[in-house]
Amino acid sequence: MIDQSRAYQYAKWCTQRGNRKVGKYVKLQAKKWLRIADGRRKDAYVSEKAYRKICKLLKLMIHPDLHCSMYDGLEDYAWFLIAAVFCTRRREDDRRFYQTAILEIARKNFKTFNSAVIFILGMLTEPCL
């Protein structure tokens, strides 16, 4: 299921040879995440259960500008960020593999909007301590 996701497709696109539309560090991170998603890392995996949960939640949320579900309205890079942060788990204790996420894009490119979506998903999915 994850290999048909927009996050996976975006990561594949980022790592294509000769792709100059993404930065060096985005390519490196996409390569690392693809290794995890393909099951080639012993310490981490992409949880299908967590991915399905995120998809269901995004289908319930309405995009304010596009008037469609967030599932359909999010950009591919946002899908990649969300899938990597919320669906990538450690094998040893099933906790999130990535504890910190950095989104560095130019101004006026939905950073605050994507941060709000991530914040809402975090409130709905992360356990209370």
Spans of features found by a protein language model:
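Phosphate/NTP-binding elements of NTP-utilizing enzymes
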Residues: M1-L129
